[in-house]
């Protein structure tokens, strides 16, 4: 399991062990990966994130056109594996969970444990501090510092 934010790791690990999920990807609605488990190659992670974000965006737009509220989850059932996509709100913005699970578990259990993980993530998420705008006299120094951090110089 890999998580970019340390506060994501414990809820994700609990979900993995309780749900028996084979693969899980947590991402922003723009497809930026926050955490993943079970993927072996980075290209798989990036492809799954892009496709998952696009599917959620298209189903939310379809719901809007139909005059319905957003769908809580989208589940694709297969013979050996199934997939669930679910978008949810966090203090850090709207995120998407993509979960792949096998026949050893049920959709209902995956959804139950997923909802518990979401509640834990919402509780654990640090509240973002409002960003202060740079003062004109500090602008050049702050820009230089930001560029050095970004490019590692």
Task: Tell where the protein language model's regions lie, with residue ranges.
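Acidic, low-complexity cytosolic segments
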Residues: 1-21, 30, 34-153
